């Protein structure tokens, strides 16, 4: 009998009941909550007269709608009335149902997918859900993590279980070592460029290989964060010493004898050597260069030394139409060099790239330089209050401010047009976020997905440059 994949092990250990239709009732260990997808779920509990099944399995924080500028006025200072109501409602719901919340003025507040690992609320072997598609981030810890809808948020609150269908297994193996200046963001963009945004549909995607093993936990979180952009609902990386070292000593992590037992169990959270995957894709890490998206889908990506594609050379009519539409929206010419794309704004942040290592990489590039005259605004938005605090202790805030970038409060910010940080129509933005869809960062905004180092370089040069030449 063949061995088990990591996904098989996680799935099998959480099945409560197998159903006749092929689906299964799965136990959920942790639910993360934010202000956008939880209000109706709490209202559903209230209308049904139910209480959360396990209050301590939930952790909440506002992130999507919070302002990243001055917060001294608290929730009442949020200008947009809908955003203010959503944040207020989360506060009220968590208070009513007894759920721990890191409120807007709590220094532990931040983006859900940053604070979960930061607090040790994300642990290896867990099933983790959140009403947010980028919940796949937590798979970096060998946790089975994926986004859910609002009705499912209510179901988990009420029962701590979900009905799910088992996915197939996909192995993405990135062999060899990455070149200097090539980051986890470049790796995942290159993967998506290779397999497309539907390449992982129906699969749990495990990332392995020498290049993945060499990444820090923060880098692995970036990789798993964007598994959803490759069509996979969940991304996974096996447990190793880096995983255990990262989790150790965090507030929600096990302590004492429980820690020793947990580590012993976590060591098995890897695919068996004889495990069989439904599909395997291999890439050579040494071939990956810094990546830049040129279109309106994460799969529309090129190396920084490349150029914007010509729709006339597309492989079929559908691809030709897609490229043509993207170029029209993005205001780009076929054949233009990636390094000729000029930027109006720069955004360094989001659940993909707002952790301390991301900020260090960006600061190293802008240190001693100034934001280019054609760049109207360059934002740096830490992923949590604790990341912000650490960055300030290291003096990173001063480096950014001296270079002309804005240092903000934690939140989702310009990743999505749900708060005050937005692009204007026709503006090009170098963004460390995860989605470059039409209007994602603001009506008519043009998003180019890049790594923190590439975004920082774009801020000071005013156009894309190969960051490998700067470090």
UniProtKB/Swiss-Prot annotation:
EC number(s) from the headed UniProt entry: 4.2.1.33
Molecular function via GO: 3-isopropylmalate dehydratase activity; 4 iron, 4 sulfur cluster binding; metal ion binding
One biological process term in Gene Ontology: L-leucine biosynthetic process
Cofactor: [4Fe-4S] cluster
SUPFAM superfamilies the record matches: Aconitase iron-sulfur domain
Catalytic activity: (2R,3S)-3-isopropylmalate = (2S)-2-isopropylmalate
Keywords for the protein's UniProt record, in alphabetical order: 4Fe-4S, Amino-acid biosynthesis, Branched-chain amino acid biosynthesis, Iron, Iron-sulfur, Leucine biosynthesis, Lyase, Metal-binding
Pathway info: Amino-acid biosynthesis; L-leucine biosynthesis; L-leucine from 3-methyl-2-oxobutanoate: step 2/4
Enzyme class: lyase
Cofactor detail note: Binds 1 [4Fe-4S] cluster per subunit.
Chain coiled-coil ranges: none
Transmembrane segments: none
Function (record text): Catalyzes the isomerization between 2-isopropylmalate and 3-isopropylmalate, via the formation of 2-isopropylmaleate.
Family: Belongs to the aconitase/IPM isomerase family. LeuC type 1 subfamily.
Protein name in the entry: 3-isopropylmalate dehydratase large subunit
UniProt source species: Hahella chejuensis (strain KCTC 2396)
Native organism taxonomy: Bacteria, Pseudomonadati, Pseudomonadota, Gammaproteobacteria, Oceanospirillales
């Amino acid at each position: 009998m063949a061995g088990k994949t990591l996904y098989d092990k996680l799935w099998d250990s959480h099945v409560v009941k197998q159903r006749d239709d092929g689906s299964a009732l799965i136990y959920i260990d942790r639910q993360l909550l934010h202000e956008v997808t939880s209000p109706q779920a709490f209202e559903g509990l209230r209308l049904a007269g139910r209480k959360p099944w396990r209050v301590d399995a939930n952790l909440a924080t506002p992130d999507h709608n919070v302002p990243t500028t001055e917060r001294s006025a608290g929730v009442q200072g949020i200008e947009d009335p809908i955003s203010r109501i959503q944040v207020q409602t989360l506060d009220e719901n968590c208070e009513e149902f007894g759920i721990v919340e890191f409120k807007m003025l709590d220094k532990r507040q931040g983006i859900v997918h940053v604070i979960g690992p930061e607090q040790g609320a994300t642990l290896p072997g867990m099933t983790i859900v959140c009403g947010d598609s980028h919940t796949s981030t937590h798979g970096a810890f060998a946790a089975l993590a994926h986004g859910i809808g609002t009705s499912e948020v209510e179901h988990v609150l009420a029962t701590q279980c979900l009905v799910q269908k088992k996915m197939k297994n996909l192995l993405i193996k990135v062999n060899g070592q990455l070149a200097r200046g090539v980051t986890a963001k470049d790796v995942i963009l290159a993967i998506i460029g290779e397999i497309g945004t539907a390449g992982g549909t129906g699969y749990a995607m495990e990332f392995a290989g020498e290049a993945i093993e060499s990444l820090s936990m923060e880098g692995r979180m970036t990789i798993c964060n964007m598994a959803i952009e490759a069509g996979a609902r969940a991304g996974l990386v096996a447990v190793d010493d880096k995983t255990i070292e990262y989790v150790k000593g965090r507030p929600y992590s096990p302590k004492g004898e429980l820690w020793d037992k947990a580590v012993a169990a976590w060591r098995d959270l890897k695919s068996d050597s004889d495990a069989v995957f439904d599909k395997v894709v291999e890439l050579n890490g040494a071939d990956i260069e810094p990546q830049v998206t040129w279109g309106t889908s994460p799969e529309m990506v090129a190396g920084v030394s490349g150029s914007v594609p010509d729709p006339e050379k597309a492989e079929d009519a559908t691809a030709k139409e897609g490229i043509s539409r993207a170029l029209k929206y993005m205001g780009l010419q076929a054949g233009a060099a990636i390094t000729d794309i000029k930027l109006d704004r720069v955004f360094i942040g989001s659940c993909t790239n707002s952790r301390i290592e991301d900020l260090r990489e960006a600061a190293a590039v802008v240190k001693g330089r100034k934001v280019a005259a054609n760049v109207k605004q360059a934002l740096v938005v830490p992923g949590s209050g604790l990341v912000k605090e650490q960055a300030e202790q290291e003096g990173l805030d001063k480096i950014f401010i001296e270079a002309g970038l804005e240092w903000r409060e934690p939140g989702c910010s310009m990743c999505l047009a749900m708060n005050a940080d937005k692009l204007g129509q026709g503006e090009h933005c170098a963004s460390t976020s995860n989605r470059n869809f039409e209007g994602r960062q603001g009506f008519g905004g043009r998003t180019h997905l890049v790594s923190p180092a590439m975004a920082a370089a774009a801020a000071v040069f005013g156009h894309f440059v190969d960051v490998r030449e700067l470090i």
